[in-house]
Amino acid sequence: MAEETAEKPVVESFQLDHTKVKAPYVRYIDTETGPHGDVISNYDLRLTQPNKQAIPTGGLHTIEHTIAVLLRERIPGYIDCSPFGCRTGFHLLTWGTHPTEEVAKALKESLEFIAYKATWDDVPATTEKSCGNYRDHSLFTAKEWAKQILEEGISSDPFERKVV
């Protein structure tokens, strides 16, 4: 293997002290400005306490598909919301920047819908044609986790509980 001389890129989420955060929360991570001045913001939507809990893949997958629609309806400039590999939450990308309180309220409303109103018909893209792992969904698990997250309250700050 050739000797590496270039510095390795810094991955922000690997710099976060996961022992200090208090989930569930919304955390503003960073903003990037593109070559044409377009601004994209990245948020950490942490649903469970790192290294203490992880949402099973079927439930997380169903939450992912459902909030793809629900957050898009609630957050102007929504681009994407993708799950963390550790299964404790999601990265949310938006055009422009939104206060964490606004994002936390949108997340709360979305989880309330999942927990108390959603039916299988509300979960989009659950067929072999529309999903890369369509058999790995669980609305029951998504509902149970959404209820638990809502009971704990979603904070607009990762280190100090400021529940919205």
From Swiss-Prot:
Record-given protein name: S-ribosylhomocysteine lyase
Cofactor note: Binds 1 Fe cation per subunit.
GO biological process per UniProt: quorum sensing
One Gene Ontology term of the molecular function aspect: S-ribosylhomocysteine lyase activity
Family: Belongs to the LuxS family.
Needed cofactors: Fe cation
Taxonomic placement: Bacteria, Bacillati, Actinomycetota, Actinomycetes, Bifidobacteriales
Known function: Involved in the synthesis of autoinducer 2 (AI-2) which is secreted by bacteria and is used to communicate both the cell density and the metabolic potential of the environment. The regulation of gene expression in response to changes in cell density is called quorum sensing. Catalyzes the transformation of S-ribosylhomocysteine (RHC) to homocysteine (HC) and 4,5-dihydroxy-2,3-pentadione (DPD).
EC number: 4.4.1.21
Organism name: Bifidobacterium longum (strain DJO10A)
